[in-house]
Amino acid sequence: HAAEGYARSSGKPGVILVTSGPGATNTVTALTDAYMDSVPLVCITGQVPTHLIGTDAFQECDTTGITRPCTKHNWLVKDINKLSSILHRAFEVATTGRPGPVLVDIPKDIQFKKGKYVKPKEVKKKNGETDIKFNGKDKDIEAVVDLFRKSSKPILYTGGGVINSGPRATQLLRELVSLTGFPITSPLQGLG
């Protein structure tokens, strides 16, 4: 949960590093919480050596299977030369689109191997991944403005999506409140 707190307060992905078996299974609650609240986390778990996977070895568990429902994506690293690209991809998946947790499971024999580090390829961000993208059609936005005008007691109820959308979204919301004078309320996830 500390990594989740870090991610919530910093806007950067939190990182979790745990051992195999019980270390990995003890992350399920935090991963589920982060998944439900769209908090970017990268969880790196240990695993028994590759040749022991599936043999009920000491502290072996199906980490990727257990965490599939509570992560955006997970990986079992079977080749040391793919580790760097998987880690770069993990951070990308955790922080793009709807943010959320991902998991990288690294068997013990892979942890002790030497491999070649490969820098990530330059990824051109899609419009909206770093800046706010307005998807509304002009007529829909005009309809919302008209509803604001006609409302006798307008109130803005905003959620965690504003926080997750970044500082620019928060700034725009503050400007809207300042311009309109509308009262605003948020659930705990939207307080930032």
Language-model segment annotations:
Residues 1-192:
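N-terminal alpha/beta PP-like core and its mobile active-site loop of ThDP/TPP-dependent enzymes
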